[in-house]
Amino acid sequence: TEVSGMADEKHESKRSCHSRQKWFSVAAILLLIVLAAGLSVRYISFVSQTIYQESTTHLEEVLHKSNNMLKEMVRKNVTYLHLYNGFLENTPDEDEIQAYIEEAQQNTGFVDFYFLTYDGNYMTVTGETGYLGLQANLDEKLAHGEDIVMNTALPGKAQMLVFVCPKNHGSYRGFAYDAIAISYYNDAVLTLLDNSAFQGNASNYVIYPDGRVVIDNSVNRKETVYNFIAMLRSYSDLSEEQITELSNAFAQGSSGNLRVKLGDTSYYLVYEGTAVQSWTMLGLVSTKIVNASLDELWF
């Protein structure tokens, strides 16, 4: 009986030891699962952040390049206007003025040259008259002697970018003017904006601080965007507070990036102040396109 009791105790001890080993094994497996899940979450978060950083960095580089090209175009054309202004001040002969401007047009490629009044009326060198519906208070800016760049659309013509240089009054063919200006179709300006990012699937915009669009170089959009901030208010997932912060960043000429959802599509948005007329340049690309592009690079 004593031997039997000892055997039972030994058997019970083995069962207890086996149970503990089984419990430790289960605990170890559960711990490994928890660790693996934690690592997976951290890895997914790391990959997501890496994709975000790489994509926004690429967009920022392309945007910065376009920004520099736009600033150079503005600088160059404002310089041309000052040269033309100097010529006009020293040349009273109107036939000579017309020949000079027409030659300059052939050399530089602008659409037209305008003798411009403070309220937007104009005369060309050929004597054609009309009205430039400009997007700003021309009178106020000319009064401050500012060089101006803004967009306009004449009846029956495509959108144009207009460069304006103030002048201390002048007269051409009896038309009294307060400034001279040259224009380019937006298509000519768009060639300066590098849209090579992500196989040409990134949209570019140039906007005023209040969101009005100066240049729209969007892709895969059916509707024209007239005001970028208004578009965000209507279609994005951004709160009013976030939109206000973004508007302030545009007004201050700041640079930055963020994720934004428009309708059912998520995008990366990057922006950079241009130092031209308080404009901001924007780049916008779908996250799906970014992820697909990076998958091709990684795999």
Segments from the language model and where they lie:
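Short acidic/glycine-rich beta-turn/loop cap or linker motifs at sensory/regulatory domain boundaries
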Residues: 117-122, 208-212
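Extracellular/periplasmic juxtamembrane segments that couple receptor/chemosensory ectodomains to their
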Residues: 232-298
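N-terminal sensory and localization modules of signal-transduction and trafficking proteins
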Residues: 2-18
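Juxtamembrane extracytoplasmic/periplasmic/luminal helical "stalk" adjacent to the first N-terminal
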Residues: 16-93
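Short, hydrophobic-rich beta-strand element in sensory/regulatory alpha-beta domains
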Residues: 81, 111-116, 202-205
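Extracytoplasmic/periplasmic ligand-binding sensor regions of membrane-associated signaling proteins
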Residues: 118, 122-196
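Solvent-exposed, extracytoplasmic
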Residues: 94-108, 179-230
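Extracytoplasmic/periplasmic sensor domains and loops in membrane signaling proteins
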Residues: 100, 125-155, 221-259
